[in-house]
C-alpha cells in the first residue's frame, strides 16, 4: 500500500509571531501552571512560543499531517466571562491520551494556532494520576471548530497516535451519526491506529477512525482491532474487498462487529469478582447475558466457535444467560470484542468475563458459572472509544470515539460497564 507523503505535523510548525502589545519578560515555557481555583478556570495560558520551538520531532513511520493555517488572536480579557450559550461552546474534549501526556504537552499540540485559552486534564481524585482525557478551551467557537476539523484523526506530535477530539458539550455539533464497524484480526505487531485507519481510508472515504486493541499492562498490540465507517455500503464492501489484504506485513482477517448505539447507556461498576476475572490471564470464560430462552447450548457453541476452540458451553436451567469457555485467552478476547451486542435468537446479548472455571464453586452453588461476575461485568461506557478506544479506566465521551460506548469498540480493559442496546442495522 502506498504510504502518504511525509509532511509536518499539526502543532509543530514554525514559531508564530509574538502577540502585539506583550510586555515584560516572557513566561517560562514547559512548566505546568499551578492548579487554579475553579472560578479562574478558563484563564489563558502563556501566549509566548516555547524556548525549544525550532526542534524537529522524530519522523513518524506512516506519514505526517499538514499543519493547519495559524490563527492568531489578541490575549483574551482576564476577567471571568459570562457562561456561554449552547451555540457559543468553545471547549473540545480530547481523549485516548497516554499517561505521560500532561497539560504542557497538550498545550504544545495546539500552540501554533494561537487560539488556546486553557487546558484541563482529568486526574483521579485519590491517586492524582491522569485519566487519559481532558478538555481544551479555545478563544472562540469558530476557533474550536477549526481545530476540530483540522486536527481530529490526524497524527499527534512525537508519537504514533492520532488526535481524538469532539465537542465537550451536548450541543448540536456533536457527532451522533451512526457508526458501522468491522473487526480486523491477524494484525502485525507494528500496526498502529493510524496505519490501520489509513489502510482503509484510501479506499473508503467514510472511514471515521480505527483502533488497535492493546494489552493494558504492556501496551503491546493484541493483534486485532476495529475500523468504523460512516457509510454502511462502504462497510459492507470492506468486509469482502479487504479480507486477506495486507496491512503492514500480514494479510488481514475481516469480520463483523456490532455497531454504535444512538441511545444513551447506563453505566455500572463491576464488582470485585468481575474485575478479578477480567484481569486473570488464565480466565477463558465468557458470560453471555440477555440470552433468548429459545437458544440452546448447541446454537451458542456455533456462534462462538469461529473465534477459537470452545471446550465448554453451559446455559443454566431457567436462566437467561450462558457461559462459553475457550481453550485460550486470545480466542475469548476476540469473541468478547466481536460478538458484544450481537443478535442471537431474538435478543441482543451482552458479554463480559465470567468467573474462571478453574475457580468455580461446588455444583450446588448458584454462582458456579460466574453469575456473580456477569452481574456487573457488562462492557461499554467508554465511557472510549475506546475504548478504549483500551487500557484507561476513565469516563470518556460516548459520542466521539466511544469504543466502549458501543459494542464495535468495546473498551473491555476498562472497569466501566454499560447496559448494551441493539446495534444499528
Curated annotation (Swiss-Prot):
What keywords are assigned to this protein?
A: Cytoplasm, Nucleus, Repeat, RNA-binding
Domain RRM as annotated: residue spans = 90-170, 180-259, 284-356
Which positions, given as ranges, span the membrane?
A: none
Q: GO molecular function: any one?
A: mRNA binding
Q: List the record's Gene Ontology CC terms alphabetically.
A: cytoplasm; cytosol; nucleus
Family annotation (InterPro entries): Nucleotide-bd_a/b_plait_sf (IPR012677), RBD_domain_sf (IPR035979), RBM42_RBP45_47-like (IPR050825), RRM_dom (IPR000504)
Query: According to the UniProt entry, which residue ranges have a biased composition of type Low complexity?
Result: 21-31
- Asked if the record carries the keyword Oxidoreductase, the reply is no
Q: Where is the composition biased (Pro residues)?
A: 1-20, 32-80
> Chief subcellular site?
nucleus
Annotated spans, Disordered: 1-82
Q: Where in the cell is it found?
A: Nucleus; Cytoplasm
Q: Which SMART domains match?
A: RRM (SM00360)
The entry describes its oligomerization and partners as: Interacts with RBP-P. Interacts with RAB5A.
The record's comment on protein family reads: Belongs to the polyadenylate-binding RBP45 family.
Protein name as it appears in the record: RNA-binding protein L
Q: What is the originating organism of this protein?
A: Oryza sativa subsp. japonica
Amino acid at each position: 500500500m502506498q504510504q502518504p507523503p511525509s509532511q509536518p505535523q499539526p502543532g509543530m510548525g514554525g514559531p508564530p509571531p509574538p502577540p502585539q502589545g506583550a510586555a515584560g519578560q516572557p513566561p517560562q515555557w514547559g512548566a505546568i501552571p499551578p492548579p487554579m481555583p475553579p472560578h479562574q478556570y478558563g484563564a489563558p495560558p502563556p501566549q509566548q512560543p516555547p524556548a525549544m520551538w525550532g526542534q524537529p520531532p522524530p519522523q513518524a513511520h506512516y506519514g505526517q499531517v499538514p499543519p493547519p493555517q495559524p490563527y492568531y488572536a489578541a490575549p483574551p480579557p482576564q476577567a471571568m466571562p459570562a457562561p456561554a450559550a449552547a451555540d457559543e461552546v468553545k471547549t473540545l474534549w480530547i481523549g485516548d491520551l497516554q499517561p505521560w501526556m500532561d497539560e504542557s504537552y497538550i498545550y504544545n499540540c495546539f500552540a501554533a494556532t494561537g487560539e488556546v485559552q486553557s487546558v484541563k486534564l482529568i486526574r483521579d481524585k485519590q491517586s492524582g494520576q491522569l485519566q487519559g482525557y481532558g478538555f481544551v478551551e479555545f478563544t472562540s467557537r469558530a476557533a474550536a471548530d477549526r481545530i476540530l476539523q483540522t486536527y481530529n484523526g490526524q497524527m499527534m506530535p512525537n508519537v504514533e497516535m492520532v488526535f481524538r477530539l469532539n465537542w465537550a458539550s451536548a450541543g448540536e455539533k456533536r457527532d451522533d451519526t451512526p457508526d458501522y464497524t468491522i473487526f480486523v484480526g491477524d494484525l502485525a505487531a507494528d500496526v498502529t491506529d493510524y496505519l490501520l485507519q489509513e489502510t482503509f481510508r484510501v479506499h473508503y472515504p467514510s472511514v471515521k477512525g480505527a483502533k488497535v486493541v492493546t494489552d493494558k499492562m504492556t501496551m503491546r498490540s493484541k493483534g486485532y482491532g476495529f475500523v468504523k465507517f460512516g457509510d454502511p455500503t462502504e462497510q459492507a464492501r470492506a468486509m469482502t474487498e479487504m479480507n486477506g489484504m495486507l496491512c503492514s506485513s500480514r494479510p488481514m482477517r475481516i469480520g463483523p462487529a456490532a455497531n454504535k448505539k444512538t441511545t444513551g447507556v447506563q453505566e455500572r461498576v463491576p464488582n470485585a469478582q468481575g474485575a478479578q476475572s477480567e484481569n486473570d490471564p488464565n480466565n477463558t470464560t465468557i458470560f453471555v447475558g440477555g440470552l433468548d430462552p429459545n437458544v440452546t447450548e448447541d446454537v451458542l457453541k456455533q456462534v462462538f466457535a469461529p473465534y477459537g476452540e470452545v471446550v465448554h458451553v453451559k446455559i443454566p436451567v431457567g436462566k437467561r444467560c450462558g457461559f462459553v469457555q475457550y481453550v485460550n485467552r486470545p480466542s475469548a478476547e476476540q469473541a468478547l470484542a466481536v460478538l458484544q451486542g450481537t443478535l442471537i435468537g431474538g435478543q441482543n446479548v451482552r458479554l463480559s468475563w465470567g468467573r474462571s472455571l478453574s475457580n468455580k464453586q461446588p455444583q450446588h452453588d448458584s454462582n458456579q458459572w460466574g453469575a456473580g461476575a456477569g452481574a456487573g461485568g457488562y462492557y461499554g461506557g467508554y465511557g472510549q472509544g475506546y475504548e478504549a478506544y483500551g487500557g484507561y479506566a476513565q469516563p470518556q465521551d460516548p459520542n466521539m470515539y466511544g469504543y466502549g460506548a458501543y459494542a464495535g469498540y468495546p473498551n473491555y480493559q476498562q472497569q466501566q460497564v454499560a447496559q448494551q442496546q441493539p446495534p444499528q442495522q
